[in-house]
């Protein structure tokens, strides 16, 4: 009976952790998630301003909560920004066309079930490992530095 109780408790704790972190798949996904003290809208406004501030093109800003209303599904605030400067992305995509799934860069700002706001994005080093493009190290370093600058400033 103790073993069963322990097992049920472990499952419930695991499900709670997944619910709180947005259902993350684990560290091998390359997704970085950082907390924000601002609302989803304000956080995304700050991320977008930061992206523009480093000369990035804004390709799209998707409001999933607004979209969900059209199909009568209620979700917590959740927005995606697609942006890029076009410096390293085309080089990487030339060598590894599937990298177009990860490039241009994306930042997701979302609210968890506890009302906490988060910013998530894919680490450039993970993209480098995923596609193993020779000679891309400087581009990947630039991607990591740029997204860290954008998100870091947005969260101040």
Model features per residue range: what roles?
Residues 14-16:
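N-terminal signal peptide c-region/cleavage motif recognized by signal peptidases
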Residues 2-7:
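Sec-dependent signal peptide recognition
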Residues 106-132:
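Beta-strand/loop substructures that line and gate deep hydrophobic ligand-binding cavities in soluble
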Residues 125-156:
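C-terminal partner/receptor-binding element of secreted or periplasmic proteins
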Residues 20-55:
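Terminal, regulation- and interaction-focused segments at domain boundaries
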Residues 48, 52-53, 59-105, 109:
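Compact, glycine-rich, soluble single-domain proteins
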Residues 34-42, 59, 134-141:
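Soluble non-cytosolic domains of exported or imported proteins
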Residues 41-44, 48, 65, 144, ...:
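Extracytoplasmic/secreted envelope proteins and their assembly/folding machinery
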